[in-house]
């Protein structure tokens, strides 16, 4: 019997749980939220689609009852608040760090062997906080960001090529932010053909730019953060772990010298399997890509410093 818990039954968490159920990734999915009745109601709503959609996964909800999350194989953390107008980066980190730290500690009381998938923002920093505050092996703490950014990159590539997104390969590394992510256009392919041979340099740069502001574009259109793709990206990461698929997925993981960086969590390609991070894959980067990655790492380190400023670490 496999079990996944999703903490936070908001838009992203509920979407993640729904995708996990629909794809029958686990036998049981538990949603936990602090708001009375929300996770229970959404779980019931999802279960009423089981006959319509043909899935056998059991989805349940609970209000702050961590005992019901016991013996989870993977736990997805989506908890936290969005940045409000006038709120500084440090204030957002201060609030969300407290929430994520508390959630992670409570989860481990009942699921000491769980693998954690962090979606809460700022994602690289919350992944780093979870790792440092819990003292778990680094293979068990994974930030989802690169999976989402890469999916957005493939979407924009497919739009430019006029093809199906499933026929495109593309990868985004670096920090999960609109100035820190690095879409690797050089390595993108369509049916094995380098995209650089199919699109002009100008068009490819447009795709890269659109990818980098992908989240902000959706926030502007929706009036809030996106949820379908982030939730699905979280479920995609979980599926590779639960089913031991050994997929190569860019995720935010703790580096100890890889890519010339240490003591931070940042997006790089990893092999995901039953142990979480099975392997960090080191790509041969160009001088320009190395420079961009180093700049991205500096920005992530700077955000991590705020954890000390607010007393979270």
Where are these regions (language model features)?
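Extreme N-terminal starter segment of soluble prokaryotic enzymes
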Residues: 1-4
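Conserved N-terminal Rossmann-fold NAD(P) cofactor-binding segment
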Residues: 32-72, 301-310
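Rossmann-like NAD(P)(H) cofactor-binding subdomain of soluble oxidoreductases
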Residues: 88-154
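C-terminal substrate-binding/catalytic lobe of Rossmann-fold NAD(P)-dependent dehydrogenases
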Residues: 134-140, 149-313
């Amino acid at each position: 019997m496999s079990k996944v818990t999703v903490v936070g039954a908001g838009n992203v968490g509920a979407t993640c749980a729904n995708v996990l159920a629909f794809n029958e990734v686990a036998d049981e999915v538990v949603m936990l939220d602090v708001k009375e009745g929300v996770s229970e109601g959404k779980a019931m709503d999802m279960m009423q689609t089981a006959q319509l959609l043909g899935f056998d996964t059991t989805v349940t909800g609970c209000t702050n009852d961590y005992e019901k999350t016991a013996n989870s194989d993977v736990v997805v953390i989506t908890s936290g608040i969005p940045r409000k107008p006038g709120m500084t980066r440090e204030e957002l980190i201060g609030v969300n760090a407290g929430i994520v730290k508390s959630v992670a500690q409570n989860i481990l009381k009942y699921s000491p062997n769980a693998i954690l998938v962090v979606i809460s923002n700022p994602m690289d920093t919350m992944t780093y906080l979870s790792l440092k505050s819990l003292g778990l092996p680094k293979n068990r703490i994974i930030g989802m960001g690169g999976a989402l950014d890469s999916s957005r990159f493939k979407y924009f590539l497919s739009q430019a090529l006029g093809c199906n997104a499933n026929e495109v390969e593309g990868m985004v590394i670096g920090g999960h932010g609109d100035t820190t992510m690095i879409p690797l256009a050089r390595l993108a392919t369509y049916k094995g053909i380098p995209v650089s041979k199919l699109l002009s340099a100008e068009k490819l740069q447009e795709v890269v730019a659109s990818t980098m502001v992908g989240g902000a574009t959706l926030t502007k259109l929706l009036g809030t953060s996106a949820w379908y793709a982030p939730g699905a990206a979280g479920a995609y990461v979980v599926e590779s772990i639960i089913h031991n698929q050994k997929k190569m997925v860019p995720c935010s993981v703790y580096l100890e010298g890889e890519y010339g960086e240490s003591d931070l969590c940042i997006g790089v390609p990893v092999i995901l399997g039953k142990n979480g991070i099975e392997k960090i894959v080191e790509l041969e980067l160009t001088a320009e890509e190395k420079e961009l990655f180093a700049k991205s790492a500096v920005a992530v380190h700077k955000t991590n410093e705020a954890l000390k400023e607010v007393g979270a670490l």
